[in-house]
Amino acid sequence: NSKFKHHVISTGNWRGMVMRTDLEPFKDARVRKAVRMAVDRQALADLVTGGAASVTCDHPVMKTDQYRADLSCPQDIEGAKKLLADAGYPDGIEFTVYPSSLEPTWTPIAEVVQQQVAAAGIKVNIQVVPSDGYWNDIWLKKPVAMTRWNQRPADQALNEIYHSSAKWNESLYKNSAFDSLLDMARKELDFEKRKSMYQAAQKVLWDESGTLIPYTVSKLIVTTARVNNLDEVENWSVRWHKVTVN
């Protein structure tokens, strides 16, 4: 309908699957990466969101953030098989993930992941659990759970989710060198140096993270065709002084 405009605005909100890095077989970073490498993120995003998403490579930094690293993460079944074999699992691995209706996309994500990673010898069992008590009984408790986060600035997201001292470090990821990188970035006054540190931290997560973050969600906004200059960056409120109406 020519009377309306359809705006697709990228956000930093994401849904994913988290593996506890303190438990076998996920203590080995190669196993964690194998699971994540075996996922076709674009296909997953298209199936679950109808394309209203932007692919991300397991780094919790929104597409429009000045510190976001430019990473590539195509599905690599053979690479995943090799990592599993190198880690001592030539016949693959098996685990159970626990989605809930608390988040409507969790079960579809789990089902798509289940189908995609099977080719790498990774068997995923799905046990849907009640939404009541999910955060107390499943999250931070089960070896593999579903998770969701709303957007945060790069510094907050990286520190709040992955620093070993963080209360909400849901994958229980611990890496002293990674912690030091984040600590130094917070102290660095030079923008380019600070940016380099945050991007290096995101590359570490691609290699070692226990969290599959396949995509960030896009916000869909419909306005009359007369509206122009609506922010392309998601904000908690519209900057009305920039908007024009013909």
Where are these regions (language model features)?
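Extracytoplasmic/peripheral linker and loop segments enriched in polar/acidic and small residues
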Residues: A29-K33, A119-Y134, N159-A225, N246
